[in-house]
Amino acid sequence: MASFAASQTCFLTTNPTCLKPNSPQKSSTFLPFSAPLSSSSSFPGCGLVHVASNKKNRASFVVTNAVRELEGYVTKAQSFRFAIVVARFNEFVTRRLMEGALDTFKKYSVNEDIDVVWVPGAYELGVTAQALGKSGKYHAIVCLGAVVKGDTSHYDAVVNSASSGVLSAGLNSGVPCVFGVLTCDNMDQAINRAGGKAGNKGAESALTAIEMASLFEHHLKA
């Protein structure tokens, strides 16, 4: 009988023992190649051993109570209060972002509980959002701005500082702070993302704020 190669694979059901061709064990049963295989392990001198598992014993977290899915909703936002921090730099663009955010809030019945705070530029978004968050008046804060790339490295410094500032504001205040700052190569890209053919980043940020406010209020509230 031809000898097995050193890397010959053994298929077992119960006893993970390498079966030799010249001394077969009648008590062991080979699994057909079509049998379901759910796990594998290695044994010395036996190569890769596949062990079949009973489907009935497989834990399914999808159909048990072991896993809960938590998420925010945008259907009921009447009770939430929001703040919008808007950078005045590139106001032609940022005002459109603000209008998109306000329109979205109105669509979801957030009509009066909105404060709009203007700051000089994207640098000032983070510290302002943090102060608003710590005031305890708001369920979420939207930060809007537009940074257009120029010929110097100033663009990278502003973008990095603005993004990290808004992130820190949310972490330090415990209130969701949404980053709605456009970072574009040119003004045309910014305009297209402020109500043009690429949508409105302000509207998207407002929707994110509603969902996050709902998530924190209904699931993550201390």
UniProtKB/Swiss-Prot annotation:
Pathway: Cofactor biosynthesis; riboflavin biosynthesis; riboflavin from 2-hydroxy-3-oxobutyl phosphate and 5-amino-6-(D-ribitylamino)uracil: step 1/2. The active site is at residue 154. Pfam families: DMRL_synthase. Its EC number is 2.5.1.78. 5-amino-6-(D-ribitylamino)uracil binds at residues 89, 122-124, 146-148, 179. InterPro entries: DMRL_synthase_chloroplast, LS, LS/RS, LS/RS_sf. One of its GO terms (molecular function) is 6,7-dimethyl-8-ribityllumazine synthase activity. The keyword Transferase applies. Residues 1-66 form a transit peptide. One of its GO terms (cellular component) is cytoplasm. It catalyses: (2S)-2-hydroxy-3-oxobutyl phosphate + 5-amino-6-(D-ribitylamino)uracil = 6,7-dimethyl-8-(1-D-ribityl)lumazine + phosphate + 2 H2O + H(+). GO terms for biological process: riboflavin biosynthetic process. Keywords: Chloroplast, Plastid, Riboflavin biosynthesis, Transferase, Transit peptide. (2S)-2-hydroxy-3-oxobutyl phosphate binds at residues 151-152, 193. It comes from the Eukaryota. Gene3D superfamilies: Lumazine/riboflavin synthase. PANTHER family: 6,7-DIMETHYL-8-RIBITYLLUMAZINE SYNTHASE (PTHR21058:SF0), 6,7-DIMETHYL-8-RIBITYLLUMAZINE SYNTHASE DMRL SYNTHASE LUMAZINE SYNTHASE (PTHR21058). Catalyzes the formation of 6,7-dimethyl-8-ribityllumazine by condensation of 5-amino-6-(D-ribitylamino)uracil with 3,4-dihydroxy-2-butanone 4-phosphate. This is the penultimate step in the biosynthesis of riboflavin. Belongs to the DMRL synthase family. Oligomer forming an icosahedral capsid. This is 6,7-dimethyl-8-ribityllumazine synthase, chloroplastic. It comes from Spinacia oleracea.
